[in-house]
């Protein structure tokens, strides 16, 4: 599951994207049950402890956008492993919960190069060495709110670690877009998982985190 390979070929196919977003909605309902069961798993499976990770990577921020809840659950697993601060990116105008409506709006925003206004109050990002950026794959890349954020705040010199939920299109072209949006940052090895499998991804997340060579960006 751990890969930053460019898998954009075919990632814009509407059937793949719609399948991504349809399964994300189903995964939200399934996750209510599976997430409860996952909470019973011994947290000791995480090989990375928060204090050790922060010692290697300096101050850590986990910044994520989640529509159906899958990416939020993945962010929580990462937070358990590395500690730091966790912030959910939200927009002034919330996205609709209706599946067809959010699919159409996400596509429209991408075509129009929209930059949705953000309602999230962010801390001074200069104080962080490592920023985890989490998102669902929408139409082959990051949701447009992240374009708003990353065109506003400079992350030069920082470690950026992408993590992504999807239902078949993996990272799409999102990692390439991150490199364009953050040309002065260090993009580290990311983690991608199907949204429907997030609840069972704890061991994979732990293995991925243990393999990250987090070092101070200074």
Residue ranges and their predicted role:
Residues 1-23:
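N-terminal secretory signal peptides
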Residues 14, 20-21, 27-49:
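N-terminal export signals
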Residues 44-76:
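C-terminal segment of N-terminal export signals and the immediately downstream linker at the start
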Residues 65-67, 89-91, 165-167:
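Cofactor-binding loop segments of dinucleotide-utilizing enzymes, especially the Rossmann-like FAD-
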Residues 84-96:
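A short beta-strand-loop structural module common to alpha/beta enzyme folds
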Residues 86, 186-192:
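Short beta-strand elements in bilobed, periplasmic/extracellular small-molecule ligand-binding domains
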Residues 94, 102-186:
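Helix-loop-strand module that forms the ligand-binding subsite of alpha/beta enzymes
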Residues 193-218:
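Glycine-rich phosphate/pyrophosphate-binding loop and the adjoining helix
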